[in-house]
Amino acid sequence: MTDLFAQYQGVETHLVVLEIIGVFFGFLSVWFAKKGNIWVYPTGIISTILFVYLLWHYVLWGDMLINAYYTAMSIYGWVLWAKNAHNNVITISRTTSRDWYICAGLGLFSLTFVTTVYYLKPFIQNNFSMEGIALGFEHFLPTEYVDVFTTAIFLVGMWLMAKRKIENWIFWIVGDFISVPLYLKKGMLFTSFQYLLFTIIAIMGYIEWKRHLRNTPAPLQK
């Protein structure tokens, strides 16, 4: 345990505090999502904005971009859910064939875009100059390959959540589970623990939403 917290040696205190706050609001957001409660979005926005800053500081661009996307999609989802909510609780449905085509397009876009960002990473870090650098996939770190994959998973999951589709939980479960060791490897212990909790809550959320669909067409109860 001491070795785990040793990852924070030399890290500025305010960064650790911001990570803890971001984790707390992220936990609240996922819990509200499980309950089908519209408060998933305001709490999520606080968390994602904090993580955009933190991930920019740690030069984890793929993660930073997906959190920026989360922020924008949370605003979109907030508006969308507000139009279809009763007492802050929304109705849910299953993903249609058309939805799956959109998911495939979003996933492909994400894979292409984030791969391009990491491919150009040496160029970007060199103040957008090609002098003395070379581009290539051989420069990719193992965590960056995983980051490309999880970013696509989360992007699709976030869109499905905004559309109130039960299948969003499947993407969250897979992405959250992969992120546990990923963030531990990146030296962000609290964030790794957050994703462990997210995995558990996502499983609970899927079970609860599935039970709702099976038993009644009425909105989820708080």
Task: Give the role of each language-model region.
Residues 27-55:
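Long, highly hydrophobic alpha-helical transmembrane signal-anchor segments
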Residues 1-36, 84-88, 92-222:
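Polytopic alpha-helical membrane-helix bundles and their juxtamembrane interface segments
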Residues 42, 46, 68, 174-177, ...:
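Hydrophobic residues within alpha-helical transmembrane segments
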